[in-house]
Amino acid sequence: MLILGVSCFYHDSAAALLDNDNIVAAAQEERFTRVKHDASFPFNAIKFVLSEKNIQISQLDAIVFYEKPFLKFERLLETYIAFAPNGFKSFCLSIPLWIKEKLFQKKNLFDKLQILDPNFKDLTKIKFSEHHLSHAASSFFTSPYNNSLILTLDGVGEWATTTVGIGKDNKIDIKKEIHFPHSLGLLYSAFTYYLGFKVNSGEYKVMGLAPYGEPKYSKLILDHLIDLKIDGSFRLNMKYFDFATGFKMTNKNFEKLFQSKVRISESDNLEQFHMDLAASIQDVTETIVLKIAQNIKDEFQIDNLCLSGGVALNCVANGKILKKKIFKNIWIQPASGDAGGALGAALAYLYNEKNFTRRINLDFMKGSYLGPSFSDAQIENILKIEKIKYKNIKDENFYDYISELLEMGMAIGWFQGKMEFGPRALGNRSIIADPRSENMQKKLNLKVKFRESFRPFAPSVLREDVNRYFELDCDSPYMLLVADIKNEIKVKDNNPNTLFGIEKLNQKRSIIPAVTHVDYSARIQTVHKETNEKFYKLLQAFKKRTGCSVLINTSFNVRGEPIVCDPKDAIKCFLGTNLDILVMNKFIIHKTNQDSSLLLDYKNKYELD
């Protein structure tokens, strides 16, 4: 059975193709269009996933959209009625688009699919999943568990913002829901907006900023903005929010509560107030997630937990669940946001609707390496066309040569194999560097990534060595768990109370300072030989040369740009930044060997997110 899953028209459009219970391919549209968080119909992603099986739309058994547009339209109308006359202007502006996109969605999808394949005639093949079921399916059906609780947390789907389900064998049963406008994801996004970052894009910046502050406003949030019950259920006080009726997340009451106006631009100074506010909403989020997790464990007595939805990308909160040992096992879908809804929609149809027999696969996600790959011949041809000078190193010396460059302090663009599906670079479209360097975080943030100095970098570590460096002794292949640095590798702080806010940034905290956040934590990727042999071998070579089995791993892009997809993207990013080396498959490109006329001004190419 060939099933295409599709998500689009909100943010992070994507497509995924299943051949029975095998993920053939999956990719986000942004990687092809180079428009970050592209919400448009995923023409390019669909063409790619179908090409991996060499089939056309008309050969598919089903095309499954990730949510139900009629239910979403119902929510939009009922919300307007509930809050009327507030929001009349936004309602009038939005209703024509809602009618087109929600009431005639099936025809809209059919027309777009026919552009890709004029022979596609069967409208009945187009199916619809529910938004939170798609999220839940993307997590449970890719997990190694026969029986698990499933917690989905995001902004909003049709009505649900939080759902608790039970996955057993090939079925998912939703047990509990919290409905719009009461949403943990939207609460976090409201603070993202208030702090001057982009909604549905900058939430991870709030999480990264939080350790620079103190949670001074947690009580204020819990007293005024959200009514949190003992079981983790909650209600927002809509007096302070405009997202249900307007185009803004917060209103004047919100500003009055915190005695400060919205930070309008990301170029405005970040003050201690902003850092304390980030720390506070992160603290409240962790409190709520932990309460929900503990309550559902107590109620259902199931030892496994699957996490999905945009809030599941909050790796700090995920790490707290792990640290509290509420569950024996935790699985997090690497594409937890709406992009992963494409995969989940296809899986929900396969199992829940078609009753396909489920086989447990310990690597169902294939490391999340589900995107395009390029042969040596393809890459070499592009290098010649672009007039790029390159060298080949013999296989037996390849990894040692790259590790030597890393030891010399080089920042390297690492382009190998299949592109990752989801927001994280996991060693195939990565920028890598030596984590032992005290200056590397500043170099990468300011000269390579062109992003804020407070942003932390993640470590990739050999799986067998993870507990040498971190308070973690389990798999974290998708960079979705945060854990503390081991005490043994910390550098003693002789003045623990003298530095505040951004002053903490330049203090050396461990023997791997470039991946140690200011609170002595790290967002960890464990690297496994079975899923990424090349990256594993590079870490082995670096360990052999330096004694350190950790590398900085950050996504191969600049701020505001999607992760690079093809060799041309990689070359442009390399030539437009202060990357020293580009490695694509076996080809090694040194910046100093290139004609200066090829260098690009990349800093202003993308709108900063």
Q: Where are the regions a protein language model picked out?
A:
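Extreme N-terminal starter segment of soluble prokaryotic enzymes
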Residues: M1-L4
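Short HxH-centered metal-ligating active-site micro-motif
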Residues: N44-E52, I63-E67, L538, T546-C548
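Phosphate/ATP-binding catalytic cores across multiple sugar-kinase/actin-like superfamilies
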Residues: A279-L305
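Flexible beta->alpha loop and helix N-cap segments adjacent to enzyme active/binding sites
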Residues: S7-A25, T33-K36, T79-S90, L97, ...
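N-terminal phosphate-binding loop and adjacent alpha-helix
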Residues: E29-I55, V289
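Feature for intrinsically disordered/low-complexity regulatory segments and propeptides
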Residues: K100-L103
